[in-house]
Amino acid sequence: MARSHAPAMCAVRPIKRIKVYSPNPANREAFAADMSAQLGIEVIALDSPDDAVSGTDIVCCCTNSFSHPVISGEAIEDGTFISNVLPMELGDDALARVDYTVKNQPLRALEHHVFSAGAPPADVTVRSEGAGWLRTVDDGTPLLSEVVAGKQRGRADRREVTFFSNNEGTGLQFAAVGKVILDSLEERGDVGVKTMPLEWFLQDMPD
């Protein structure tokens, strides 16, 4: 996720420097070297998540943490934009620093969560409609699509801390990648071949 977030942010903002933290020193150093070469900007690896967050305009939490927050509220400064990949990446103290939240979509898997050992069950207090594991949740939080369409406001001022809550993914990227793969097979005349290279479906350990 971090390796896709970095070029995405650089595509829409004039990023001058990226700071990265990972609990694995080798991974964060490799990420810094690779992204610096790819993006042509300074990328530095740091020894603590607070150092990475402090003084940063855009904070992207791209981890595999299902049960523990990865940033602290004390490190978040006024005017910061925050995004997450997993819901537990921001704890109560970090959420308390947020002034304005926009979420991905109104759908949540209320009865199909993945919990790590010892994690308490979800306390779902918002009103919901629907049946089974997929329900429509109305908690009053604006949607990203509504902000893009001009139906909801964006940032109110330069000091406002804003948060994009990735409450549930849509998986559209998988459909897009599938289309690219299919087009490639058609160009090679391989449509109908059922075996694809295994490396297309694997990745290295996360950063």
Regions found by a protein language model. Give the residues of each.
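Beta-strand segments within the central parallel beta-sheet cores of soluble alpha/beta enzyme folds
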Residues: 17-21, 48, 77, 193-198
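N-terminal Rossmann-fold NAD(P) dinucleotide-binding loop
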Residues: 2-3
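A structural signal for isolated positions on well-ordered beta-strands in alpha/beta enzyme cores
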Residues: 18-19, 44, 162
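Rossmann-like adenosine-cofactor binding region
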Residues: 40-128
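NAD(P)-binding Rossmann-fold cofactor-contacting core
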Residues: 11-36
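Conserved active-site and cofactor/substrate-binding residues in soluble primary-metabolism enzymes
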Residues: 23-26, 30, 54, 77, ...
